[in-house]
Every structure is written in structure tokens, then in C-alpha cells.
């Protein structure tokens, strides 16, 4: 069993924010694999699918980003899931827009959602870092991540969420390198020379 977590802030006001790309990718996975409707549990919204023969619990914490660990910790304890079987989809400032990297453990790179999760379950969980680019100046970061994606970014955001969903079975199997490679190829196929 794996716990697949998408990070974001709840509510319509935040729905299109760059910080919510984890929610967007999780929603795409739920749609593409015909997940039952999300229901409230663990201070979040949960559903369940099967990926590559693995039971996969989908979790969108509803605690606001900075307290995501409360929801993830609660789910992990109840489901008796080890950190190595938890995969967190989140926005990543330090990657160019549309790029994806998977890593296990390590620091939080200033990401408050990851900081909270690490405080609750330790840092040995897997992270799917979804690149949103950087505004160029640290002083602009807060407004940038809490700002909506521009209309000009819609094509790559949609292509990235679809590519993550299409490659999700590889994540479930622990084939992180193959997951990254497939996303790169899918993005290239979808956007051609317009890959960001």
C-alpha cells in the first residue's frame, strides 16, 4: 500500500495557486483512474485507487499547507504506513517550470508543507518535486507561490498533471527514474518545442 499525498491550500481562493500544483496533480490522478468521490478523513480528503496492483490511498490535506503534517501523520498512523511508502506531490521553486524530480529524504528547501510533514513522520518519505520556477528574488516568493498560474502557463500545467497521472503506476512500483523519464517524454510529446 502507498499513501499518495497532494499538497495545497483548501478553498476556492487558492485553487489556481502555484502552491496548489500538488492538489492539481492528485486530482488528475483521481480522475484518470476513476477514483470514488473524495470523502473527509484524517483532516483531509481521501479516496483510493489501485496502481500497478498496489492499493493507493489518495490524500489531500485540508489543514492548510503549513500544517499538512498533521493530516499526513494521522493517515500514516491509522493506515500503518511507513514513511518509505508515502509519496508527496508538491510545488518546487528550485526546479524550472514543468520539470519533475523524485527524491527520498533530505531537506525541505524552505517548503513549509514538507517541514510540517517531516516534523510529524520524519524525512524518509518520497517527494515528487513539481517545478514551478522561481520569481528571481526571495522577496517575491510568497506572492509568487500564492499567486495563480498565468493563462500562458495553463498548457504546461495541464500537460504536467496529465503526465504525472499517466506515469503514476511507475511511482507505485518504486521506479522513480522511469517515472521521471516518462514524464519528460510525455511533456515533449504534448508540448513539442513549447516545453517550458
From Swiss-Prot:
Keyword set includes Oxidoreductase: no
Family: Belongs to the PTH family.
Subunit (UniProt): Monomer.
UniProt cross-references to NCBIfam families, sorted A to Z: pth (TIGR00447)
Residues forming the catalytic site: 19 (proton acceptor)
Catalytic reaction list: an N-acyl-L-alpha-aminoacyl-tRNA + H2O = an N-acyl-L-amino acid + a tRNA + H(+)
EC number, UniProt record: 3.1.1.29
Lineage, top ranks: Bacteria, Pseudomonadati, Pseudomonadota, Alphaproteobacteria, Hyphomicrobiales
Site location (Discriminates between blocked and unblocked aminoacyl-tRNA): 9
UniProt protein name: Peptidyl-tRNA hydrolase
Enzyme class: hydrolase
Keywords linked to the UniProt accession: Cytoplasm, Hydrolase, RNA-binding, tRNA-binding
Keyword Signal in record: no
GO biological process, one term: rescue of stalled ribosome
GO molecular function terms listed in the Swiss-Prot or TrEMBL record: peptidyl-tRNA hydrolase activity; tRNA binding
Protein localization: Cytoplasm
Function description: Hydrolyzes ribosome-free peptidyl-tRNAs (with 1 or more amino acids incorporated), which drop off the ribosome during protein synthesis, or as a result of ribosome stalling.
Pfam families per UniProt: Pept_tRNA_hydro (PF01195)
Annotated site (Stabilizes the basic form of H active site to accept a proton): 91
Gene Ontology CC annotations of this record: cytoplasm
Organism: Methylocella silvestris (strain DSM 15510 / CIP 108128 / LMG 27833 / NCIMB 13906 / BL2)
Residues reported to bind tRNA: 14, 64, 66, 112
Amino acid at each position: 500500500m502507498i499513501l499518495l499525498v497532494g499538497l495545497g491550500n483548501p478553498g476556492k481562493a487558492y485553487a489556481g495557486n502555484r502552491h496548489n500544483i500538488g492538489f492539481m496533480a492528485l486530482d488528475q490522478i483521481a480522475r484518470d483512474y476513476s477514483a470514488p468521490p473524495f470523502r473527509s478523513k484524517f483532516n483531509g480528503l481521501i479516496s483510493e485507487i489501485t496502481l500497478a496492483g498496489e492499493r493507493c490511498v489518495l490524500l489531500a490535506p485540508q489543514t492548510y499547507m503549513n500544517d499538512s503534517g498533521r493530516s499526513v501523520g494521522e493517515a500514516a498512523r491509522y493506515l500503518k504506513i511507513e514513511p518509505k511508502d508515502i509519496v508527496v506531490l508538491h510545488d518546487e521553486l528550485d526546479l524550472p517550470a514543468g520539470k519533475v524530480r523524485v527524491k527520498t529524504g533530505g531537506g525541505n528547501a524552505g517548503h513549509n508543507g514538507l517541514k510540517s510533514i517531516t516534523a510529524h513522520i520524519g524525512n524518509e518519505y518520497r517527494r515528487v518535486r513539481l517545478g514551478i520556477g522561481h520569481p528571481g528574488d526571495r522577496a517575491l516568493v510568497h506572492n509568487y507561490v500564492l499567486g495563480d498560474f498565468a493563462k500562458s502557463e495553463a498548457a504546461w500545467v495541464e500537460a504536467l498533471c496529465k503526465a504525472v497521472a499517466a506515469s503514476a503506476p511507475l511511482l507505485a512500483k518504486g521506479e522513480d527514474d522511469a517515472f521521471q523519464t516518462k514524464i519528460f517524454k510525455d511533456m515533449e510529446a504534448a508540448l513539442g518545442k513549447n516545453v517550458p
